[in-house]
Amino acid sequence: MFTGPIVAVGEYVEGLGEGRRYVSIPYYRREIERVIGARPFPGTFNVRVEREERESLRELASSYGYRIEPHGEYGGAWLYPCLVNGRPAWLVFPDLTEHRDQVELISETELRRELNVIHGDMVKIEVWGPSTWKLARRLTCGPSGGR
């Protein structure tokens, strides 16, 4: 079983506002809150990575991550915990996306401001295997792991 870490380095890119709309829809906001244990900042943090890296991260998320089922026109998504420049965040892989060379991240805070980055800055994304992050969730969220 994979324990990690996988490290992907990519370029922060400004989005088009699709993530903000998605996160602001009550159904998705509630589901994201259920998974991450906090109210998400209304928007996503987009990072351009190599397609192979994106596909590896997506495969990990769809194998071991949390599923948000489709609802309405936006479809579903897979979520998987990560660190971006050392800060906790969640990778989001929507079923419907135009960004084949990007990964989207969500957090309870505005990552762009928290990390003090601008369009074009390089960031590091780190992910671990499910046994590692499930243990971390139990230690920080209690025995239920935040569920």
Curated annotation (Swiss-Prot):
<keyword id="KW-0808">Transferase</keyword>
<dbReference type="InterPro" id="IPR023470">
    <property type="entry name" value="Riboflavin_kinase_archaeal"/>
</dbReference>
<dbReference type="GO" id="GO:0009398">
    <property type="term" value="P:FMN biosynthetic process"/>
</dbReference>
<comment type="pathway">
    <text>Cofactor biosynthesis; FMN biosynthesis; FMN from riboflavin (CTP route): step 1/1.</text>
</comment>
<feature type="binding site">
    <location>
        <position position="44"/>
    </location>
    <ligand>
        <name>Mg(2+)</name>
    </ligand>
</feature>
<dbReference type="InterPro" id="IPR039063">
    <property type="entry name" value="RibK_CTP-dep"/>
</dbReference>
<keyword id="KW-0418">Kinase</keyword>
<feature type="binding site">
    <location>
        <begin position="15"/>
        <end position="20"/>
    </location>
    <ligand>
        <name>CDP</name>
    </ligand>
</feature>
<dbReference type="Pfam" id="PF01982">
    <property type="entry name" value="CTP-dep_RFKase"/>
</dbReference>
<dbReference type="GO" id="GO:0000287">
    <property type="term" value="F:magnesium ion binding"/>
</dbReference>
<keyword id="KW-0479">Metal-binding</keyword>
<comment type="function">
    <text>Catalyzes the CTP-dependent phosphorylation of riboflavin (vitamin B2) to form flavin mononucleotide (FMN).</text>
</comment>
<feature type="binding site">
    <location>
        <position position="97"/>
    </location>
    <ligand>
        <name>FMN</name>
    </ligand>
</feature>
<feature type="binding site">
    <location>
        <position position="104"/>
    </location>
    <ligand>
        <name>FMN</name>
    </ligand>
</feature>
<feature type="binding site">
    <location>
        <begin position="109"/>
        <end position="112"/>
    </location>
    <ligand>
        <name>CDP</name>
    </ligand>
</feature>
<keyword id="KW-0285">Flavoprotein</keyword>
<comment type="similarity">
    <text>Belongs to the archaeal riboflavin kinase family.</text>
</comment>
<keyword id="KW-0547">Nucleotide-binding</keyword>
<protein>
    <recommendedName>
        <fullName>Riboflavin kinase</fullName>
        <ecNumber>2.7.1.161</ecNumber>
    </recommendedName>
</protein>
<keyword id="KW-0460">Magnesium</keyword>
<dbReference type="GO" id="GO:0008531">
    <property type="term" value="F:riboflavin kinase activity"/>
</dbReference>
<dbReference type="InterPro" id="IPR023602">
    <property type="entry name" value="Riboflavin_kinase_CTP-dep"/>
</dbReference>
<dbReference type="GO" id="GO:0000166">
    <property type="term" value="F:nucleotide binding"/>
</dbReference>
<keyword id="KW-0288">FMN</keyword>
<dbReference type="InterPro" id="IPR023465">
    <property type="entry name" value="Riboflavin_kinase_dom_sf"/>
</dbReference>
<feature type="binding site">
    <location>
        <position position="46"/>
    </location>
    <ligand>
        <name>Mg(2+)</name>
    </ligand>
</feature>
<dbReference type="GO" id="GO:0009231">
    <property type="term" value="P:riboflavin biosynthetic process"/>
</dbReference>
